[in-house]
Amino acid sequence: MRLPHVLQEQFLSLARPNTLKNIETCGILAGNLKNNVLTITTLILPKQTGTSDTCSTENEEDLFEFQNKHDLLTFGWIHTHPTQSCFLSSVDLHTHCSYQLMLPEAIAIVCSPSQTPNFGIFRLTDPPGLDIISTCRAERAFHTHPDKPIYTDASDTGFIEMINFDVNVVDLR
């Protein structure tokens, strides 16, 4: 998957007002498939609500309409952890599971501007992570999972290619 270097900087700039208020911000990573290569070309910030440790999209039909109009595929999502470290919480794992069930190559990016490391690109392991999360029936939002490698850093696997090109930014908030 090809990912623009400027994505993190542009997303954090848009998220900054929320980050300063300790509110998470999320976005959708969209792009195209060309010559068997997935390329993220567009960052879409949908209408959303957030708290210090959650972010939920709203009016998804606006997002789908924009993507359909511009022939954009969904390749994953990006969100901030305003004060927490760079990891996937149990809520994040369940959110990402739906993306990865639809597209096995889907990624989840976490930006933690106040921490080191401050940027991570993650995927559920398959197996066992995708199976564990997709069959989890815990009722509480934040909960524990078995102590197994449920997700991995996608940038360590050679799966992500950081390249030097611009990203289109669409703010639907």
Q: Over which residues does each language-model region extend?
A:
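Conserved beta-strand-loop surface patch within small alpha/beta domains used
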Residues: M1-T74, T83-R173
